Amino acid sequence: MASATLTAWIKMPSFLKKILKLRGRRQEDESRSRTLSDSSMLSCRVNQLTSEGTEAGSTTPSTLPKDQALLIEPKVRAKEKSQHRRPKIIDQVRRVESLGEQASQRQKHMLETLINKIYTGPLGEELVQTLYLRIWAMEETPESLKILQMREDIRDQVLKMKTERWLRTLIRGEKTKLKDFQKRYEEVHPYLMKEKVEQVIMEEAWSLAAHIVQE
């Protein structure tokens, strides 16, 4: 049958062949346009459903049915309450981090006097020389190398600032006593085992602050 069709096609006049070809192309174009039309309609429908879903997801409790609104409102209130509570927690952390500010008035005065001497007097020069020699003599670490390679004035300032930080770490609370220092040392001991430079600085800070704690 296929051979008969082929024979008929060969015998067909050329103008009829052109007509049939044009008709075939027209049918293909119509079929393609219908497919595109169906796709565009489907896309519009999907967009509409997505838009409706988004609007439904952003519905406020006031537009929901009463039973659903009752379920959502406690969650909203809990979230607002946690947001109000958070600054208070942050404030507590800041109070702990502002080391030295919680010391008794007498200890606080002695602490600030000591820190001032470190930055402005011969005590500070003696401190940085002692720290430099101890760090130079210790086992080499990345931190010790970093400090030893600093320019002298920058190194002195860094060592003084690190000492001040340890002083404020050790001297805090209503009144710092020896047992308080022991507890704080135990807290930072694991850190000091890894940071030998900090251990050296902490020991010198404690040596300077011992008279304040024993006061």
From Swiss-Prot:
Bridged cysteine pairs (disulfide): none
Q: Could you tell me which residues belong to the region Disordered?
A: 12-34
Q: Where is this region: Involved in self-degradation and in host STAT1 degradation?
A: 15-22
Q: Where this protein primarily resides, as one coarse class?
A: host cell
- Does the UniProt entry include the keyword Membrane? no
Coiled-coil residues are none
Q: How is it modified after translation?
A: Protein Y2 is produced not only by alternative initiation, but also by proteolytic cleavage of C'. Only alternative initiation is detected in vitro, whereas in vivo cleavage seems to be predominant.
Entries under InterPro entries matching the protein? Paramyxo_C
The subcellular location is:
Host cytoplasm
The residues that cross the membrane are: none
Q: Which UniProt keywords apply?
A: Host cytoplasm, Host-virus interaction, Inhibition of host innate immune response by virus, Inhibition of host interferon signaling pathway by virus, Inhibition of host STAT1 by virus, Inhibition of host STAT2 by virus, Interferon antiviral system evasion, Viral immunoevasion
Example of a GO cellular component annotation carried by this entry: host cell cytoplasm
GO biological processes: symbiont-mediated suppression of host innate immune response; symbiont-mediated suppression of host JAK-STAT cascade via inhibition of STAT1 activity; symbiont-mediated suppression of host JAK-STAT cascade via inhibition of STAT2 activity; symbiont-mediated suppression of host type I interferon-mediated signaling pathway
Function noted in UniProt: The different products prevent the establishment of cellular antiviral state by blocking the interferon-alpha/beta (IFN-alpha/beta) and IFN-gamma signaling pathways. They inhibit IFN-alpha/beta induced tyrosine phosphorylation of STAT1 and STAT2. Blocking the IFN-alpha/beta pathway requires binding to STAT1 in the cytoplasm. They inhibit IFN-gamma induced serine phosphorylation of STAT1. Block the IFN-gamma pathway by binding to and stabilizing the parallel form of the STAT1 dimer, further inducing high-molecular-weight complex formation and inhibition of transcription by IFN-gamma.
- Family note: Belongs to the respirovirus protein C family.
Comment, domains: The disordered region at the N-terminus is involved in C protein self-degradation in trans. This self-degradation of C protein may play a role in the regulation of viral RNA synthesis. The disordered region at the N-terminus is also involved in the host STAT1 degradation in order to counteract the host innate antiviral response.
Please give the subunit comment from the record. The different isoforms interact (via C-terminus) with unphosphorylated and phosphorylated human STAT1 (via N-terminus), favoring the formation of parallel STAT1 homodimers. The different isoforms do not interact with host STAT2. C protein interacts with L protein; this interaction has an inhibitory effect on viral transcription and replication.
Instruction: Supply any other comment.
Output: The C protein is found in virion at a ratio of approximately 40 molecules per virion, presumably associated with the nucleocapsid. The P/V/C gene has two overlapping open reading frames. One encodes the P/V/W proteins and the other the C/Y proteins.
Protein name as annotated: Protein C'
Q: What is the native source organism of this protein?
A: Sendai virus (strain 6/94) (SeV)
Q: Which gene encodes it?
A: P/V/C
